Amino acid sequence: MPTFNQLVRKGRKVIEKKSNSPALQKGFNSKKKKPTDVNSPQKRGVCTVVKTSTPKKPNSALRKVARVRLTNGIEVSAYIPGIGHNLQEHSVVLIRGGRVKDLPGVRYHIVRGTLDTAGVAKRMQARSKYGAKRPKAGAASK
């Protein structure tokens, strides 16, 4: 507990909240070639590396991860959700915020079913999250 004099001298600091997805809060003005402070829900980027990585301690798997260079010039790691994907180097993808708890440094998800990213094949439930189209009426009875 500070004394009254200490508070007069220093004062209290207001704690500023850090963003969970800082790359989505920077834009880039290509005409002026300057970074801007523009928040956006998603950003477009180009895959530079598509690889698998292993999760933290209690879990074991090969998680699919892509390194993406965004339109604002920042390069981030993004998780590729769902079973199977068609991404490779130079694929254009859309990323959204959302970390993967057991992969350190992965703070973004790739949006399936947009741009060069195909939706998950044969996905029947939670289709909108994986970019899967609605199956035809005849194919539903399986």
Swiss-Prot record:
Residues carrying 3-methylthioaspartic acid: 102
Residue numbers spanned by region Disordered: 1-43
Pfam families hit by this protein: Ribosom_S12_S23
CDD domains: Ribosomal_S12 (cd03368)
InterPro entries: NA-bd_OB-fold (IPR012340), Ribosomal_uS12 (IPR006032), Ribosomal_uS12_bac (IPR005679)
Gene Ontology terms: cellular component: small ribosomal subunit
One GO MF term: tRNA binding
Keywords of this entry: Methylation, Ribonucleoprotein, Ribosomal protein, RNA-binding, rRNA-binding, tRNA-binding
Gene Ontology process terms (BP): translation
Parts forming coiled coils: none
Listed Gene3D superfamilies: Nucleic acid-binding proteins
Task performed by this protein: With S4 and S5 plays an important role in translational accuracy. Interacts with and stabilizes bases of the 16S rRNA that are involved in tRNA selection in the A site and with the mRNA backbone. Located at the interface of the 30S and 50S subunits, it traverses the body of the 30S subunit contacting proteins on the other side and probably holding the rRNA structure together. The combined cluster of proteins S8, S12 and S17 appears to hold together the shoulder and platform of the 30S subunit.
Family: Belongs to the universal ribosomal protein uS12 family.
Subunit description: Part of the 30S ribosomal subunit. Contacts proteins S8 and S17. May interact with IF1 in the 30S initiation complex.
Protein name in the entry: Small ribosomal subunit protein uS12
Species the sequence originates in: Ruminiclostridium cellulolyticum (strain ATCC 35319 / DSM 5812 / JCM 6584 / H10)
